[in-house]
Amino acid sequence: MSSRKSKSNSLIHTECLSQVQRILRERFCRQSPHSNLFGVQVQYKHLSELLKRTALHGESNSVLIIGPRGSGKTMLINHALKELMEIEEVSENVLQVHLNGLLQINDKIALKEITRQLNLENVVGDKVFGSFAENLSFLLEALKKGDRTSSCPVIFILDEFDLFAHHKNQTLLYNLFDISQSAQTPIAVIGLTCRLDILELLEKRVKSRFSHRQIHLMNSFGFPQYVKIFKEQLSLPAEFPDKVFAEKWNENVQYLSEDRSVQEVLQKHFNISKNLRSLHMLLMLALNRVTASHPFMTAVDLMEASQLCSMDSKANIVHGLSVLEICLIIAMKHLNDIYEEEPFNFQMVYNEFQKFVQRKAHSVYNFEKPVVMKAFEHLQQLELIKPMERTSGNSQREYQLMKLLLDNTQIMNALQKYPNCPTDVRQWATSSLSWL
C-alpha cells in the first residue's frame, strides 16, 4: 500500500516539475507579455500613450526605440500592444503590421507582406500600380470604413529598422513617414534598432518627415535590481496549481538569491553584460538540471551553468584534435612568437614541426608530408586558422598565407585539459622560443 502511495506521490511530483519547466522555459525563451518589465517604466508609459493617441484619437505618430541587443525593445513593444489590445474599442478597430529588416530585404517583399498581414490580397488582385506610393496608398484607402473620417488605424512595427534604411531610395520609410505626417489614414510607425547613429542613415527627405521621437533603452539598473530580476524570473506565479510545491520552490529561490556563491555568479554575469538574455541563458541551463530526484535548483547548478555560459568554444575544439594537429598548432604558436603575429604558410609550419621531430630520438611524430598537409587543411575546415586572402586556382597551397585564430592563453589552457597529452609535446608548447 505504501509503495503504491509513494509511486502516486512521485507521479504528482514529476507532473509538478514538468509544469515548472514549461512555465519557466516559456518565460526565458519567449519573453512573453505576462512577464514583468524591468527598469523601463518611463519608456513604457511614453510608448503606451503614443499608441493610445493613434488607436483612440486617430493621431499619426512615428517613434524609434533604440537600445543594445537584449535590452528589451521587443518585450517593451509587446507589452504596450498587449495593454492596448485589451481596450475593447481598440481590439476591434486597430490593425498591426510586423515587418523585419532581416526578412523583408527590399520594398517589393515588404509591400507583399503588408498586403498579406492586412488581408488585402483579394482587393489588390491583378491591379497594376504606377509607383510604390500609389500601391501603399491604395492599401490604406481600402481599410477605410465608409467615409474618410472613420479610417482604421494601422500600427507598423519595423524590427531591425536600420536594415530598411539600406533599401533602394528608402521608398518604404519615405512613404510610411509621409503618411504619418499627412491627414490620411492614422498610422503609427515604430522602428526598433540597436544603431545609435540611425538618423545618420536616413536620407534628407525621409528624415524631414520623421517626428524625431526616440525612446532609449540602456539597461540602467544596478546589481540589487539585477538580483531582484533573478528572483522574479525564477519564481513561480501565485496561480500555480500545486500551492505547497510553489511555496517551497519560491522559498528556495529566495534562499539562492541570498547565497554568497550565487551572488558571485550573478555579479560576474552582471559585470560582463546586463543583457537579460544572458541571464535567461544562465537560468535555462540551471533549470535543465532540475529532475524528479533533484527537484530544487542549487547554488552548484548555477555555478556549473555559469561555467557552460563562459566556455571557450574554440578551446573546446582543440580537445578533440589529434596529436599531430596539436603539434601543428604549437608550431604556429611558436611562429607567432618569433615573427610577432605575422602570417605564416604551411611550409613554414612544416619546417617548424620538423625541428621538433628531429630533436626527438624516436620517430613517433615522423609523419609523411601529405599527411601533415591533410591535418593542416582539417584545422582550416575547423576555422582554427584562416587564409589571409582568397585563393586563386593556380596558387600553391603550401605557400598560401594563413593566420592562427587562437591566442597563446587559449592554446595553453586547452593543452592543460587535453586528455593524455604527451609530455614532450607539452614541454615543446611551454618552451619560450622554438627549437632553433
Swiss-Prot record:
Disorder noted: Meier-Gorlin syndrome 2: A syndrome characterized by bilateral microtia, aplasia/hypoplasia of the patellae, and severe intrauterine and postnatal growth retardation with short stature and poor weight gain. Additional clinical findings include anomalies of cranial sutures, microcephaly, apparently low-set and simple ears, microstomia, full lips, highly arched or cleft palate, micrognathia, genitourinary tract anomalies, and various skeletal anomalies.
Similarity section: Belongs to the ORC4 family.
Residue numbers bearing the N6-methyllysine modification: K7
Keyword match Cytoplasm: no
UniProt xrefs under SMART domains: AAA
InterPro entries from the UniProt entry: AAA+_ATPase, AAA_16, ORC4, ORC4_C, P-loop_NTPase
Subcellular location: Nucleus
Binding-site positions, ATP: G67, P68, R69, G70, S71, G72, K73, T74
GO biological processes: DNA replication initiation; polar body extrusion after meiotic divisions; protein polymerization
Assembly behavior: Component of ORC, a complex composed of at least 6 subunits: ORC1, ORC2, ORC3, ORC4, ORC5 and ORC6. ORC is regulated in a cell-cycle dependent manner. It is sequentially assembled at the exit from anaphase of mitosis and disassembled as cells enter S phase. Interacts with DBF4. Interacts with POLQ.
Function description: Component of the origin recognition complex (ORC) that binds origins of replication. DNA-binding is ATP-dependent. The specific DNA sequences that define origins of replication have not been identified yet. ORC is required to assemble the pre-replication complex necessary to initiate DNA replication. Binds histone H3 and H4 trimethylation marks H3K9me3, H3K27me3 and H4K20me3.
Keyword Nucleotide-binding: yes
Gene expressing this chain: ORC4
GO cellular component: chromosome, telomeric region; cytosol; nuclear origin of replication recognition complex; nucleolus; nucleoplasm; nucleus; origin recognition complex
Domain of life: Eukaryota
Name of the protein in question: Origin recognition complex subunit 4
Molecular function per GO: ATP binding; ATP hydrolysis activity; DNA replication origin binding; nucleotide binding
Coiled coil: none
UniProt KW keywords: ATP-binding, Disease variant, DNA replication, DNA-binding, Dwarfism, Methylation, Nucleotide-binding, Nucleus
TM region(s), chain numbering: none
